[in-house]
Amino acid sequence: MSINTSGKITSATERADSADFRTIIRNKIPLMDVRAPVEFGKGAFDLSINYPLMNNDERADVGICYKQNGQEAAIKLGNALVSGQSKARRLTQWQTFARENPQGYLYCFRGGLRSQTVQRWLKESGINYPLITGGYKALRQFLLNELEQLALHPLTILAGNTGSGKTPFLAHCANSLDLEGAAGHRGSSFGSFVTPQSNQINFENKLAEQYIRGDFSLEQRLVLEDEGRLIGSVHLPESLRNAMTLAPLVVIEESLEYRLEQIYQEYIIKMTAQYQAAYGVEQGFTAFSEYLEHGLFKVRKRLGTQRYGQLKEIQSTALTQQNKGQPQYHLDWLKPLLSEYYDPMYQYQLGLKSDRVIFRGNNSECLAFLRD
């Protein structure tokens, strides 16, 4: 495929529409989503970008027209709404995407009129661009089926106290999946990131995409981090959750000092940098402070009113000192939070499933065990 001097994409062999979802996901093929923004916001795919045929209001008007007057009238209204300058602007977006992503595909909800319309208008402009057969709905169903396959694998669950390094540990395991990465949340009261968390549909899509790209054989054992039913605001697929509750556990054991340093770097140093990169130094520090305060507030009932008040005061002092260039003061409230709240809670939870523990050790020992 090439682009000629007139800017039109030409090809000796025109690319066909595709239902080869596995190859599309595995190879990270760019996708152009022509659904309305409201649809895209409810759920999309990892490498998709939204260049809609109709905006939200136009889609709603066409939908009402379809219900009241039928398909022919709805198509006529759609053509009237997307015409002139609005059509030209959108066509330019589609053309640019096609030129920049000659290996890509486009899709609407079911692979019907909307994607076919965009495909036809592109063709009239000299660009032959294929679509996803069955659209979003078909690809979404494929990913849901893959999640069911994931739950059939033999699993090993990686457990350990807060700060033991479970998530970075997974990066060293070729046969692992990062549930928290797919969820966009680290699972604890302080687990949110600067960017908003994935919604449920996007979490499922991202997890399935990650699984497909791992190209695992069905008999291959997978390593997953120990998680509750919820990771932030999203929940694990039921079949996967059920499989995880029966799987053997490998427990990382590291000292309080080691874990405290991990927490300090991850939740203080890195999060400060991320907030300030997103919002600027002053606004970023304010947002970071609110993030920490909110995290502590969420565990106030478990701490008790008096202890929460004490740690809140220490945290406030630490933020003041950090703003003066001394972030190490955060250790004064992080240490008791770990030793008095997170450690007892996690040890209680681990005690309920101690019969499933097959190995305990530090990071290096656990990694060696899983590689054997």
From Swiss-Prot:
Its EC number is 2.9.1.3. PROSITE patterns: RHODANESE_3. Residues 25-148 form the Rhodanese domain. Keywords: Selenium, Transferase. GO terms for biological process: tRNA wobble uridine modification. It catalyses: 5-methylaminomethyl-2-thiouridine(34) in tRNA + selenophosphate + (2E)-geranyl diphosphate + H2O + H(+) = 5-methylaminomethyl-2-selenouridine(34) in tRNA + (2E)-thiogeraniol + phosphate + diphosphate; 5-methylaminomethyl-2-thiouridine(34) in tRNA + (2E)-geranyl diphosphate = 5-methylaminomethyl-S-(2E)-geranyl-thiouridine(34) in tRNA + diphosphate; 5-methylaminomethyl-S-(2E)-geranyl-thiouridine(34) in tRNA + selenophosphate + H(+) = 5-methylaminomethyl-2-(Se-phospho)selenouridine(34) in tRNA + (2E)-thiogeraniol; 5-methylaminomethyl-2-(Se-phospho)selenouridine(34) in tRNA + H2O = 5-methylaminomethyl-2-selenouridine(34) in tRNA + phosphate. Involved in the post-transcriptional modification of the uridine at the wobble position (U34) of tRNA(Lys), tRNA(Glu) and tRNA(Gln). Catalyzes the conversion of 2-thiouridine (S2U-RNA) to 2-selenouridine (Se2U-RNA). Acts in a two-step process involving geranylation of 2-thiouridine (S2U) to S-geranyl-2-thiouridine (geS2U) and subsequent selenation of the latter derivative to 2-selenouridine (Se2U) in the tRNA chain. Belongs to the SelU family. Monomer. PANTHER family: TRNA 2-SELENOURIDINE SYNTHASE. This is tRNA 2-selenouridine synthase. It comes from Colwellia psychrerythraea (strain 34H / ATCC BAA-681) (Vibrio psychroerythus). The gene is selU.
